[in-house]
A protein has these predicted regions:
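Electropositive polyanion-binding surfaces
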Residues: 1-240
Length: 240
């Protein structure tokens, strides 16, 4: 009943990033416009040497820091030289996340409960894993910020492969059935939530998710909406 990781302990140790140690990596430089869309990019093999480790405690202290304050909270003292970079990263993460929502990404506030009884189910991939929705951006959570950039890198890599006719594995999912979405929409309308419908009286999953954000019943409706979303599956893009 023990969890068996995909990588052996030796490979996991060899591939891990540690502060002050150089490590081989695949890096990407992406230029985004004001709408959060990638305009130019470059993938390359690099050597990465981390200079600091950022914790949720540090990000919480950064979020609570007063603008223009010269005082540095205790949680930020070990990374005081990187505060400016962190603020830039958070700004970029906000812009990318907003761009995802404008492009129709579905946002559900359904974090995995940190219950010991869940065992390995508590662990999810930094980018959200194999699902058709994303969680809200949490500025105090390092993995939430990292997930935004990982999704951007994944999306750019997919577009890169399509542009250059390269074989690649991509995650794809079918659209939810309109009947299932209508059931969630009816529940939202019954709670007097503002909801826009098209000429056929239906709405998209992303628009429905956005309408639920301000609702006190958001979690219950998010759970119902999640049940309408099909799990993505890997598909191989063949080179022609």
């Amino acid at each position: 009943n023990k969890w068996i990781p995909l990588l052996s302990p030796n490979l996991s140790k060899a591939a891990a990033f540690k502060v002050g140690e150089s490590q081989a990596a695949v890096s990407v430089r992406i230029d985004f416009d004001s709408e959060g869309s990638a305009r130019d990019w470059e993938f390359c093999l690099t050597q990465i040497q981390p200079v600091a480790e950022v914790t949720s405690e540090a990000l919480t202290a950064l979020a609570g820091r007063k603008p223009r304050s010269r005082a540095i909270p205790t949680a930020l003292k070990t990374i005081k030289d990187q505060i400016g970079q962190l603020e830039t990263l958070i700004f970029c993460a906000k812009a990318l996340h907003a761009g995802e929502l404008r492009q129709g990404q579905i946002e559900l506030d359904l974090p995995t409960p940190d219950l010991e009884t869940l065992g390995d189910l508590r662990a999810t991939a930094p980018d959200g894993g194999n699902r058709q929705w994303i969680e809200p951006l949490r500025e105090e959570d390092p993995f939430s910020i990292l997930a935004t950039f990982l999704r951007a890198a994944h999306s750019t890599w997919t577009q890169h492969c399509l542009d250059f006719n390269l074989p690649a594995l991509v995650l794809q999912a079918n659209e939810p059935e309109s009947g299932s979405l209508n059931d969630v929409a009816k529940a939202a309308i019954a709670l007097d939530l503002p909801l826009s419908l098209d000429e056929e009286g239906t709405t998209s999953a992303s628009e429905l998710a956005q309408a639920l954000i301000s609702s006190p019943s958001r979690r219950v409706l998010n759970l119902q909406l999640r049940q309408t979303l099909q799990d993505p599956v890997f598909r191989l893009i063949q080179s022609k």
